[in-house]
Amino acid sequence: MKRVVVVTGLSGAGKTTAMGFLEDLGYFCVDNVPGSILEELLKLFMSSDLEKMAIAVDVRSEHFSDPVEAIEKIKKKTNALIVFLEASKEELLRRYALTRRRHPLQRNDVGLEEAIEKERQILLPIKEMADFVIDTTKMTSHQLREILGQSLMNQSGGISVRILSFGFKHGIPMDADFIFDARFLPNPHYVPELSHKTGLDREVEEYFKKYSLVDEFVYKIFEVVNVAVKEYQRSGRRIVTVGIGCTGGRHRSVYIAHKIAEMLKKEGFSVVEKHRDLEKV
């Protein structure tokens, strides 16, 4: 079965990294295709021996007068997977300062910050039609490749659920569909013999088992996520990200994320369990 992936999103959010990864996976990669030859390109691909093609679409308007229309055309012709990459304004400003490259919408009368916000508004309709929205603000290139690979692996195999623990003091994951706050639960950080351990350690698990409130919270999260994921699956959604946060991201959120992941696996879902801030102080 032929597979088409469209990589789009904000300039500076990681499209080059994503396209390089897809090329490594054997995709025929096409960047900055003129809109006038897009339809012909799709016809050639569908009739060729190529199995996988990735197309990068952005706001370079001399090539795509309407990026939304271009992606709708690709989707209609190929049932493509749409990957939308974004990052916070502050992170994009930092990246442009490092590379000293010019934003595609930047002009003499349009500064970088204004160009970033203008692009965000132009691409909002594409973000809303995307299969995957990946926020790369706090990601390394390796992490982006890992998440993109997981997304592609589940393209034809039903829905994938990402269970992500994090610490609120390190920032909220902006790509999460659900955020659950575990900061009201008892905190093993204040137990001297447990403070250096994590929510994956047996001693911490035994600590949490003393509190019925913890079990109740875990079950309530599972109930909500289980119902939501099943409905998302029926609607054709391919990935759902569930964020569970505590203060530092080492004890409460890690324990709960691990428990929820185990419960969802028993329901037959494809689950990716990540602990973003486990090694942070």
From Swiss-Prot:
Alphabetized GO MF terms: ATP binding; GTP binding
UniProt protein name: Nucleotide-binding protein CTN_0898
HAMAP family given in the database record: RapZ_like
ATP-binding found in the keyword field: yes
Function description: Displays ATPase and GTPase activities.
InterPro entries: P-loop_NTPase, RapZ-like, RapZ-like_N, RapZ_C
Chain sites annotated for binding GTP: D58, V59, R60, S61
Species: Thermotoga neapolitana (strain ATCC 49049 / DSM 4359 / NBRC 107923 / NS-E)
Cell inner membrane keyword on record: no
Entry similarity comment: Belongs to the RapZ-like family.
Keywords assigned: ATP-binding, GTP-binding, Nucleotide-binding
UniProt-listed PANTHER family: RNASE ADAPTER PROTEIN RAPZ
Binding site for ATP: G9, L10, S11, G12, A13, G14, K15, T16
Domain of life: Bacteria
